[in-house]
Amino acid sequence: MSETKTPLGFIGLGVMGEPMCANLVRKSGHPVYVADISPEPVARIGALGGHACASIIEVAQTTEIVFLSLPSIVQVEQVCTGPGGLVEAAGRVRIVVDMSTSDVGRTRRLAEVLRGHGILLILSLIHI
């Protein structure tokens, strides 16, 4: 019997996000679905074996766990609760792992909003 691996989502393929996502694609053994406002890093991750998505909604409808690597809490809020975001997609997402540098108070408020939609927000800061 073959084991089905949980599909993972990754949104934000910038300077830090793209290499982290590339490692997930290469080493995790999970299918990884990606989205970014810029098509170039999406294409590069696709060339490594990631699945390019045209929108956040497509990521949300395909994955249960989504990693975010975004510039600030502003973009995190937009991706999670804005138009075309994870909440609006009413997809499969149950866990969001935010690796962005975000304001603590706003992150706590966002966690409460997401919890109301059955989504757990995990803050996973990256220190360099």
Language-model segments: which ranges?
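A short linear hydrophobic-aromatic micro-motif
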Residues: 54, 123-124
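Rossmann-fold NAD(P) dinucleotide-binding segment
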Residues: 56-68, 73-120
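Conserved small/polar residues in nucleotide/adenosyl-binding loops
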Residues: 126-128
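NAD(P)+-binding Rossmann beta1-loop-alpha1 motif at the extreme N-terminus of oxidoreductases
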Residues: 1-61, 65-68, 94
